[in-house]
Amino acid sequence: MTMIESFVKDRNEALFSLDRRKIEAYLVKYGEGETAKAPDMLFWASVYKAICGINGAPKDVLEKAHTWLSRNGFSIPS
């Protein structure tokens, strides 16, 4: 497995889990420790926006992302 494939696998497993602890561990592993410490609203907005940008994201996870972003006043990336 290449480094890119490993990164994508880790990213998808973390983000699609919607488990904050798992996502925080992924962020710290890849040098985004500050994002892991973000307040809830900013953290989840970042997570859901990132999910919207992933080709092949599971439909149910993508729908949760769209719903959360809409309910919290954020735009949905196209």
What kind of region is each of these model predictions?
Residues 2-42, 46-49:
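N-terminal acidic leader/helix
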Residues 68-69:
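Repeat-associated, polar segments at repeat-unit boundaries in modular proteins
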